[in-house]
Design a protein with these regions (language model features):
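Conserved S-adenosyl-L-methionine
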Residues: 97, 180, 203-214
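Flexible, glycine-rich beta-alpha linker
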Residues: 185-186, 214-217
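Core alpha/beta nucleotide-donor-binding catalytic domains of modification enzymes
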Residues: 20-170, 180-184, 188-192
């Protein structure tokens, strides 16, 4: 089999397309169960603001919060594989939990209220029920409609679980992320409900549709961010300044991955375990 080489290297990365044994991720040395969360925080002795990541997935938002200076003490998600990944990479509590369950919400808020002041509750409740992409497929055929109903309708009210944690824990601020479609015709009632409920809980609320490319990320998909700051506890939220006004000037996908060698699939007997990295080709990398 002939494999084209990258113009930057004569040594393309070859991937043997065979699924190996499942990788078992070891927990972070400083991970703890939900029962021990208050003691973990007490022993933490950190000056960093404490944050909670709801619907944390594998930990993308947790990583961003960590880089922003927060101490993420708790990440919650319903998927065991996501929590295993989160628990591997982050200290504190990575808790598998069904946030639609009142019992589980009570358990989480009870522990958090023993942890001292929480500065931020952040997270992105599942967006599939509000995504236009799902709605287009919803009308394709009966099988897709059934799949949509079974997988997504039960997730539609999880934003309420997010706000329940905010109301019970009273963090200084919250940050909710979702698709922009939640503020569009058809779902505006939910969007207005989020704003109204947060304001009744004592938060000043601001929402903005953010285009990632404007902030230096090579991605076109916009996301809606709803930021709330507790009146009397902290100053109003300030949105970040945009880096790019025009898409043509923004970073592109090629700017992000052009330093990577070509990835070749299929069965290759003489495949390589490693690849020599040529180094970054631009400032983004």
């Amino acid at each position: 089999m002939t494999i084209a080489s990258s113009p930057k290297t004569k040594d393309p990365y070859r991937l043997k397309s065979v699924k190996g044994p499942e990788v078992i991720l070891e927990p972070h040395p400083q991970s703890c169960p939900i029962e021990d969360l208050p003691k973990y925080v007490q022993d933490l002795k950190t000056s960093s603001p404490l944050a909670v990541d709801l619907f944390c997935g594998a930990g993308g938002l947790s990583l961003g919060l960590h880089k922003a200076g927060f101490e993420v003490i708790l990440g919650c998600d319903i998927r065991p594989d996501s929590i295993a990944t989160h628990r591997h990479h982050f200290p504190g509590c990575s808790h598998q939990s069904d946030l639609s369950s009142i019992k589980h919400l009570d358990e989480i808020t009870e522990k958090l209220n023993k942890c001292g002041e929480i500065s931020l509750v952040a997270g992105g409740p599942p967006c599939q029920p509000f995504s236009r992409n799902i709605r287009w497929r919803k009308h394709a055929n009966e099988e897709v409609v059934d799949q949509y109903n079974s997988l997504n309708e039960d997730r539609r009210d999880l934003w309420e679980s997010f706000l329940t944690v905010v109301e019970d824990v009273e963090p200084k601020a919250f940050l909710m992320e979702n698709v922009g479609d939640i503020a569009q015709t058809g779902d505006q009632e939910i969007f207005r409900g989020i704003i109204s409920r947060a304001e009744k809980a004592g938060y000043r609320v601001d929402a903005r549709l953010i285009y990632a490319w404007q902030l230096g990320v090579p991605q076109l998909r916009p996301r809606l961010f709803i930021a709330g700051t507790r009146i009397g506890a902290c100053s109003p939220f300030h949105w970040p300044e945009v880096c790019f006004e025009s898409q043509k000037d923004a970073w592109k996908l090629n700017d992000a991955i052009s330093d990577l060698p070509p990835l070749v699939g299929d069965w290759l007997e003489n495949w390589q375990d490693k690849h020599s990295y040529p180094g970054p080709l631009n400032d983004y990398q």
